[in-house]
Amino acid sequence: MGTRPLLRCRRTLAVAVLAAVTAAAPGALPARGSSASAAAPAFDTSPAREALERLLPSRADQFTLVPVEEPPAGASFSVSGEAGAVEVRGTSPATLLAGVGWYLERVAGVDIGWPGESVQRLPATLPGVPATLTRSATVRHRYALNDTDEGYSGAYRDFDSYRHDIDVMALHGVNEVFVPTGAEYPYHQALQEFGYDAAELRRWIPAPAHQAWWLLQNLSGFPDPVSEQLVEARAALGSRIARHLRALGMTPVLPGFFGTVPPGFAARNPGAVTVPQGKWVGFDRPDWLDPTGPVFGRLAEAYYRAQRQRFGATSMFKMDLLHEGGTPGPVDVASAAGAVQRALEAAHPGAVWVMLGWQTNPGAALLSGVDRSRVLIVDGLSDRYDGLDRETQWGGTPYAFGAIPNFGGHTSLGANTGVWTSRFHAWLAKPDSALAGIAYLPEGTGGNPAAFDLFAELAWQPGPVDRQEWFAAYAARRYGGADPHAAAAWEQLRLGPYSGLSGTWSEPQDSLFTARPSLTASRAARWSPTAMRYDPDTVERALAELLRVAPALRTTDAYRFDVVDVARQALTNRARVLLPRIKSAYEAGKLETFRSLVREWSADEELLSRLVGSDRRFLLGPWLAGARAWGGDPAERDRLEYDARSILTTWGGRVPSETGGLRDYANREWDGLVRDLYAPRWNSYFARLDRALVTGTAPEAVDWFAVDDAWARGHGTYPTEPTGDPVSLAGEVHAALVAATSARVVEGRAGRVRRG
């Protein structure tokens, strides 16, 4: 105790001295204690300090942050120091945080994940660093967030939520983040100079949860007009997000302008030529303004001017021409792409155009029309298919190794981590490699923390990662201490959900509990895997091991999240065993067997609802409360709630939902959804099958869209705080699974005896 004030004084003195000197000359991280010229520091470390105080409020004062000029080789950090006095040297505020993150994991043995943390296990005095830790990024671009992230992760969050996510991304070495929040603002402002009034434009702009697909030129105007106050509030939030990123030395990646315009644009603007874009899964796509025509440059200038005035300048802009079925019509694609890039260059000289590598985009014609040195393709398919040669396909255009381990914000556990660790460094080492970054692109974030942790680390490891060693180390820090049962649990998860193979899918299967009721259901979302992608026993074994973790570690936030998540996945996987048995009983006309199995299914869904209700990150209530909080009056609150409910269920109107296949695309096992939508759907369906067995008639048909749409338009409230004990409820799941397995064994033996 007696040494603490002295340590604190030393740290205060160190910070004061460092603020008056320059960081080391470019080329290397200076050795600790080396002299520096009496000039201004390389950058202001206070944003990193403030982030530390948010993330580690009672330990932040034990870190000294030293700014260092970034050498041509790129970002780097080093960590050294004695107990209670840890020095981190880095080339940006965000890189300083990455150094802190490396220290927390490698020295202090705790985790700040996305989500879940174990910092409560830190000792009062932080441990010293036995040997200096040094890391340099192997790639310049460390990009995060899918175009759809805001829609599927929550379009109605507040600044504190976004700031926390950015702080955590920085802690894991990310330096470029897509910021779509408030993207409607420059359209709303610029298009008023081209014949539209504000009210018209607010009818064209979609509500926040659906806005990502408007930016991708897939739809417009759904579900209701947005208000002036909402446009303004979102612009204010987006501006704060961009400022926070800049303060940390990170790059906000803003949506660029590539020609999306409202109906009737050509009629109001002589000389303009627009190309109808047809339909996107049932939605009318917005028109595309020909970038080679005389009006495009003027509109692009107005757009970028309004954007810069509100959001500030940046150096990276996201644009995807002809996304998912867009058509160029008579427009020459190469010329159009060149015009789009020239407009960007005029507004932001030297800016990088970020494109998504998805399906066949970007095509050779598009790339032939641009300066490829100022393009970055964030590849959404790096881990999905085999036989990829991006250098040949994209003609040497710089690209980022990317992954989409989650679609629609599904709560499924797992990822193709073995593909990541085998491919990334192999692609980087190719003689003609154009690999320039990583891109973490799940459609929804806030789950699968091990996947994010491992993927982000690829950019900071000098060579291939040994997955077995990595997961063992992850288990040792995740709950703030080494534990043999935690290690065994994560080894099972590595062997199971986190060993997905390439070839077809990049995400795990979704849940049958969330699927539209059918005896032949194999997935909930139309584009999800139709079968298990791993041995489900690995998850049950992992759950059994997690429940044996030492009591002291069970109090951590990370453990409580993980035990719910793993128990949820284990219970969910059982549905794929149970549903075929229900189908067999129904088709065989075995009423009592059918009823018994249906009772098991219903009991599992009831238990699932209670389980996920024990962790706030699996609650529907905050999602809906957040949406309503953005409304300026009761009517707007109701409209925004529908926006938030519909994206999770019907997604759109009847045609996009049913014919287009978007229904349940964003399914997730959240309390509220399970209890009030998914379970009642299955109960209603099974009741109809039961009546059909009793009466010998065909089951009554159901208009499931009407059922889902009624729920989406409802206004029932849901808990915003968890209830129940996560560990006890996970234990209930384990007991139920053990009992079910035992019952199947007994049933199998009885069947063999009868046959004998």
Task: Kindly give the residue locations of the regions a language model identified.
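Contiguous, structured surface segment used for ligand recognition
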Residues: 39-139
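N-terminal low-complexity, Pro/Thr-rich disordered segments
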Residues: 26-39, 746-756
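Second-shell loop/turn segments in exported
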Residues: 84-90, 150-156, 228-229, 290
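C-terminal amphipathic alpha-helical interaction region
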Residues: 578, 583, 591-748
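C-terminal substrate/ligand-recognition segments
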Residues: 529-554, 564-587
